[in-house]
Amino acid sequence: MEPLILTAAITGAETTRADQPNLPITPEEQAKEAKACFEAGARVIHLHIREDDGRPSQRLDRFQEAISAIREVVPEIIIQISTGGAVGESFDKRLAPLALKPEMATLNAGTLNFGDDIFINHPADIIRLAEAFKQYNVVPEVEVYESGMVDAVARLIKKGIITQNPLHIQFVLGVPGGMSGKPKNLMYMMEHLKEEIPTATWAVAGIGRWHIPTSLIAMVTGGHIRCGFEDNIFYHKGVIAESNAQLVARLARIAKEIGRPLATPEQAREILALNK
C-alpha cells in the first residue's frame, strides 16, 4: 500500500468564525495554520481565500498573497487552490486563479444541490476549465460528489478533454444534497472508479459526521484523506476542534498505529504526478 497523503482544507468558502472561532482567514493566519498542519503530517493545503472580514474571495492578488505567505514558512508543502470558490460565484472568477499556475487545483465534475443552494458546474464550463488546466500546466484534482460524476469524468477522458494520467479523484461525501458518507457508498465509489478510470488515484473528504468513517476506510484500502475546517469543525461530537492541525495529527497518529506510513513531500508529488 502506498504512503498516505493527508490534505488539510484549512478554510473553505462556507465555514464562518461563528461556526468555528479558530478558522484561519488572513494570509498570515493561513500560513501559520499550513505550517502547523505540515508539521502534523499534511502534505497538501487545499486553499480557499477570504477577505479580512471573512467574505469568500477569488481575487488573484489575495490568492498570491496567501500562496506567498505559505511558501515562505513551509516551502515543501503542495498548495492546491480551489476553483470552486463559494456557491454562486461567477465561473470566470472561479477560473481566473489558474493563471497563477499553482502546482495543483480542483476541478468540480458536476452540478449538485448544496444545502439550500445549487452548486452549478455546467458541462460546457467543466470543459472550459479542463482546457485551462492544460493551458496553464496545472495538475487537476477532480472533485466527485456522486457516482454519475465518475462516468462524466470517464467520458471527458475518452474525448481527450482531460488528459492527466494518473488522474487524482477526490470523493466529497456527506454534502447535504450529495451522496452520503456511508461506508457502503464509499466502497461502491471505489469499485466504480476502478472500473471506469483504473489508473486513477483517489482521496476522500467526509463532511461532518462522515469524516472519521470515510477516513478510516480510506486509510486501510489505499486511499488518501482530506480533513480540515472546510469539511468538519469538530474534534468529537459537540467539541469544536482547536485547529486544523489537531485534525491532521489525529489521522497521522491512527495511520502510524495501523502501520501505514505518511507520504514525504517527494512521495506525495510522485503519487499525484506533479513531477511529470
From Swiss-Prot:
Zn(2+) binds at residues 46, 48, 230. It holds the Pfam family BKACE. It is an enzyme of class 2 (transferase). GO terms for biological process: L-lysine catabolic process to acetate. One of its GO terms (molecular function) is 3-keto-5-aminohexanoate cleavage activity. (5S)-5-amino-3-oxohexanoate binds at residues 14, 82, 85, 106, 108. Gene3D superfamilies: Aldolase class I. Its EC number is 2.3.1.247. This is 3-keto-5-aminohexanoate cleavage enzyme. It comes from Cloacimonas acidaminovorans (strain Evry). The lineage of its organism: Bacteria, Pseudomonadati, Candidatus Cloacimonadota, Candidatus Cloacimonadia, Candidatus Cloacimonadales.
